[in-house]
Amino acid sequence: MTQGPLTTEAGAPVADNQNSETAGVGGPVLVQDQLLLEKLAHFNRERIPERVVHARGAGAYGTFTLTRDVSRWTRAAFLSEVGKRTETFLRFSTVAGSLGAADAVRDPRGWALKFYTEEGNYDLVGNNTPVFFIKDAIKFPDFIHTQKRDPYTGSQEADNVWDFWGLSPESTHQVTWLFGDRGIPASYRHMNGYGSHTYQWNNEAGEVFWVKYHFKTDQGIKNLTQDEANRLAGEDPDSHQRDLREAIERGDFPTWTVQVQIMPAADAAGYRFNPFDLTKVWPHEDYPPVEIGTLELNRNPENIFAEVEQSIFSPAHFVPGIGPSPDKMLQGRLFAYGDAHRYRVGINADHLPVNRPHATEARTHSRDGFLYDGRHKGAKNYEPNSFGGPVQTDRPLWQPTPVTGVTGDHAAPSHAEDDDFTQAGDLYRLMSEDEKGRLIDNLSGFIAKVSRDDIAERAIGNFRRADEDFGKRLEAAVQALRG
């Protein structure tokens, strides 16, 4: 902000910002005091709707640097040349908590990454876990309702949470991850990020590959125990935000090594489980991660509301050479994110500095709406026309996905190893005895709060189906807590 006298929103100088205008000394306030009315009216409208999920967050700008030639797999321009640097903005978040919630809680962390490429903005909207609780977006509103406050009690209820998870056995893998050591990262800098979904890459020849993104923290994985998190949430609820901001301020820029797993399109139909199932990971022995670049965060936002709260991300923001997969959860998110931001920030949210393309120009025939900035000046607002302006390229961003059968409410195609428990059991068996002990403690402490035996027993039963030892130890721990 430039130096000079205080002004009204219209730019007129303010004579007195300490006293309202009144009818005489001690008299009633006058409606002609437009500064008072302007300040109160603006104050009443400072808040916009918070995100229905991922409300609590922090963000920073940075740079993605390509370190490997991947042109054999994708024609995306920002992935076309070793050493190429692309500006980014990354927003971290928790999922269930409101805008004023604490950072140090047991909850997945959102990982929303915007690449400002010369072909438009590419948004990769994932989490700090490679899997999720459900595999079809039609269940997402129901799932989130269980994570939020109960409409009667006004609190998050253990009954609701475990009732849904128990009746949705596909959640077993993600819940095992969440209640393990990585369920509460020590900071945003000390956790990995994942695209989670499967995405399409396509090259200049039109060949298709399915990919999964991994961002491995170079700071090392650090986590909090439940007791440490409880203390920190009370003493410093802004701990994650503060840690990220202060690290960048002192020049300790956090970095991540970027990897992708790559599956030739021909492998998908015959793979041992559905490769588009968001509740499963691709084993590294089947598709080893390929290192392709580095991500560095090196600049803090100057205004949290303008750049973090008003930032928008959508999994539908693709660039040439990258596209969606048949992942049913991803397909729902392609609509939901844009719709949420149009409601929350407005139809012209893409015009805000943090959201608009930085390395190219958006050229559309869309016009007007709240806070339209007049960027198109007098250009024609329709196409085709006889006066010039942007026209279509006739080249899709991604390759079409072959389909068979008829329309209907179908489950995903069946594969030989599509069960909901094997990978949860594999994760449990990878843990050390100490890690298993903490997992059991974390789970049992929450399940013991459930008021109905059938809900608790169903939840425990899912973990037993993942691993017999897992279920037995958890059942004993819950019984001990419940007396």
Swiss-Prot record:
Gene3D superfamilies: Catalase core domain. It holds the Pfam family Catalase-rel. The active site is at H54, N127. Residues 1-24 are annotated as: Disordered. InterPro entries: Catalase (IPR018028), Catalase_3 (IPR040333), Catalase_AS (IPR024708), Catalase_clade1/3 (IPR024711), Catalase_core (IPR011614), Catalase_haem_BS (IPR002226), Catalase_immune_responsive (IPR010582), Catalase_sf (IPR020835). One of its GO terms (cellular component) is cytoplasm. Keywords: Heme, Hydrogen peroxide, Iron, Metal-binding, Oxidoreductase, Peroxidase. It catalyses: 2 H2O2 = O2 + 2 H2O. It is an enzyme of class 1 (oxidoreductase). Heme binds at Y337. Coiled coil: none annotated. Its EC number is 1.11.1.-. One of its GO terms (molecular function) is heme binding. GO terms for biological process: hydrogen peroxide catabolic process; response to hydrogen peroxide. Belongs to the catalase family. This is Bromoperoxidase-catalase. It comes from Streptomyces venezuelae (strain ATCC 10712 / CBS 650.69 / DSM 40230 / JCM 4526 / NBRC 13096 / PD 04745).
